[in-house]
Amino acid sequence: RAHTGKNKVIRLQGHFHGWHDHMTSGFNSHHDGTPTRGVLPSVAESVILVPPNDIDCIHERMSSDSDIAALILEPTGSTFGMVPLVDGYLSALRELTERYGVLLIFDEVVTGFRVAKGGAQAHYGVMPDLTTLAKILAGGLPGAAVVGSREILAALDFDAMVAAGEEKIQHQGTFNAYPISAVAGSTALSIIEASDVNERANASGAFLRQGMNQVLHRMRIPWVAYGEFSVVHLFTNPDNRVIDPSSFDPLKIPWQELKRNSSHAVTKLRLAMLANGVEFNGFPGGTISGAHSEADLIFTIEAFEESLNMLQSENEI
């Protein structure tokens, strides 16, 4: 907003960007843009929510509203690809944002340095104006960064703003320039740069998804493990679709349905997985590390099968 002099932000329904006031509506509730509890209506009104993968809707919004400062999204799709984006979507966004003078922001808090050494933007070949980074950035310690063009980031530079006669953007923070996180992050990024950790983690993701789907097929459970890179998403099929894991295409499922997993079954599955020695994320699924060995992955697949057996024995699935 400071750079463009505009006020509004476009966001995609279902995409997560933290829980500050401008980002609470539209992730898992209030998809109509109304404010969540405690958020001022005037704040919610400055955010435009649009459905994912609808480039025409974004075009219409940008062409009819000259007060849009930025568009922010997760470049792999909501929740690290739980709701993937169609091919060419990011390139189309880049073209539209440049045409209408809107900044393009990638939220790579999860995907940065994970999808590829250069993050999702390097993998897809689309360069945003700003990118948010965290998690891997600080080597597992508290730490985050906003990166982007020198022209935009100059608003954070004391000397540049004094020279320009403009007010500097405030950005105080508890962990700003925190040396321990900086050392951990620098070390972690050096390891990533010099190794094949990305490729190994991505290959492990494919191995785990395949193994889980083999279990589901063998047990005749109409669920599917899917995803890309080093993540596995588990679709628990809330509407009881006929599913073939070998041909499952999440783009053919409404995004709301992909995110509407059975909370009861997922809770029971997570408890069963814990009982069998594996922490399973609640989205549901998980991310794979380059440190995970083949033995770890096989152990996870076996724990998954035993956990499903436990749920079946209790008539939970």
Name what the model sees in each region.
Residues 1-317:
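Conserved N-terminal phosphate-binding loop of PLP-dependent enzymes in the Aspartate aminotransferase
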